[in-house]
Amino acid sequence: MASQGTKRSYEQMETGGERQNATEIRASVGRMVGGIGRFYIQMCTELQLSDYEGRLIQNSITIERMVLSAFDERRNKYLEEHPSAGKDPKKTGGPIYKKRDGKWMRELILYDKEEIRRIWRQANNGEDATAGLTHLMIWHSNLNDATYQRTRALVRTGMDPRMCSLMQGSTLPRRSGAAGAAVKGVGTMVMELIRMIKRGINDRNFWRGENGRRTRIAYERMCNILKGKFQTAAQRAMMDQVRESRNPGNAEIEDLIFLARSALILRGSVAHKSCLPACVYGLVVASGYDFEREGYSLVGIDPFRLLQNSQVFSLIRPNENPVHKSQLVWMACHSAAFEDLRVSSFIRGTKVVPRGQLSTRGVQIASNENMETMDSITLELRSKYWAIRTRSGGNTNQQRASAGQISVQPTFSVQRNLPFERATIMAAFTGNTEGRTSDMRTEIIRMMESARPEDVSFQGRGVFELSDEKATNPIVPSFDMSNEGSYFFGDNAEEYGN
């Protein structure tokens, strides 16, 4: 990459820091998760949660959502200017679950946002600690990615629902900064840009005036983020075309959809980080561990180690399978929703099954669900091996994939060949190579056609024993490539937003 010199590692983006060496990065990431842990402990005290209740993932999510809501400036401002009946713009809350006489009860709590902000800042040495907030957003985003399909959102923007492997981070708020941008998939960026262009088509003032100038800057910035994810010159050149367009319209939408399709084979670089629920960091801080002193990394062994030693509980509905509930959360913790199931299974040490075969709904419980029948279980979040998370799409080559999801986006740097369904993908590229991007389109199609099965991605990278913290002895697994590798294969997962 030409721009390598100016790139910050995404640990640095995560902590908002300038260039730092490895030790400083580990320390600042440690400070970030330590702050989350301290905040969580304080909230458990405020809410008088028992140790068990504090380890309940549903309680963790409510507490995380409260602090995110308390710091959501734009929404807070909007709520104050547009008061809606029954919603106090100065308060935030949610369901907290407590165990009374052997039964789980739901308690709706309400707190002043100001109070939550005070507790958060106090846990973070008086700072706003936006990095920690983004970290929580990415954990929620990873959980959504593992739980829901984005079929409807894809179809609405004119994309193919089988392109779901490109949709990482599609539920991340816009305000998630550089760290958020790094984990967004190519499809997510394309979808955001298409929505913007469509608004411009329908509203002639969208690009005009002082607001329009700001809109234009945002548009070009998003184009540059997407351009930076592509690994080939032709894809990047096409992004320049889209960015420089005087009046973005249907031609740009066409180009973007073409680029999204091309990313199924010529994969973009999408960062992966293991972001854990706040209660996990809370448990570790409570045990006396000093994250900042010891240092921490989101992409190495550390999150695996935390999960090896933490007990997290979850509420479970009567007909749900605890093993499946655990798989869902494990995938979310490691940002592995679009990873090849064979790789995930090897690392986890137990079979990871496609979404359609899971007997479990999402982790969160709706307010109208009956608590009488709820039970709780221990989530099994341990793994057999660990592997370094990747920020590249790997080299591409051909391999059998499935009907429901026709490509993968690797999470772990593990040597393998990457499955994609060439016939299905190439069928979408018939005909249309005319117009101002014709030479780039032709070049991209040529590269896609010549992607070979022999090319192994992540040459020589493997998985590591949990005792091998310095990653000295890679174990390169061999995968049975005749099996199915896609998670959203022929799937019936719920839509996000139900």
Curated annotation (Swiss-Prot):
HAMAP family from the UniProt entry: INFV_NCAP
- Tell me what this protein is called: Nucleoprotein
User: From which domain of life does this come?
Assistant: Viruses
Motif Unconventional nuclear localization signal per record, residues:
1-18
Keyword terms: Capsid protein, Helical capsid protein, Host nucleus, Host-virus interaction, Ribonucleoprotein, RNA-binding, Viral nucleoprotein, Viral penetration into host nucleus, Virion, Virus entry into host cell
Output the PTM entry.
Late in virus-infected cells, may be cleaved from a 56-kDa protein to a 53-kDa protein by a cellular caspase. This cleavage might be a marker for the onset of apoptosis in infected cells or have a specific function in virus host interaction.
Q: What does this protein do?
A: Encapsidates the negative strand viral RNA, protecting it from nucleases. The encapsidated genomic RNA is termed the ribonucleoprotein (RNP) and serves as template for transcription and replication. The RNP needs to be localized in the host nucleus to start an infectious cycle, but is too large to diffuse through the nuclear pore complex. NP comprises at least 2 nuclear localization signals that are responsible for the active RNP import into the nucleus through cellular importin alpha/beta pathway.
Q: Which InterPro entries match?
A: Flu_NP
Name its GO BP terms in alphabetical order.
symbiont entry into host cell; viral penetration into host nucleus
Q: Motif Bipartite nuclear localization signal, which positions? A: 198-216
Q: Please state where this protein is localized.
A: Virion; Host nucleus
Which family is annotated?
A: Belongs to the influenza viruses nucleoprotein family.
**A GO molecular-function annotation:** RNA binding
- Assembly and binders: Homomultimerizes to form the nucleocapsid. May bind host exportin-1/XPO1. Binds to viral genomic RNA. Protein-RNA contacts are mediated by a combination of electrostatic interactions between positively charged residues and the phosphate backbone and planar interactions between aromatic side chains and bases.
Is-annotated flag, keyword RNA-binding?
A: yes
Organism field: Influenza A virus (strain A/Swine/Italy/839/1989 H1N1)
Region called Disordered, residue ranges: 1-21
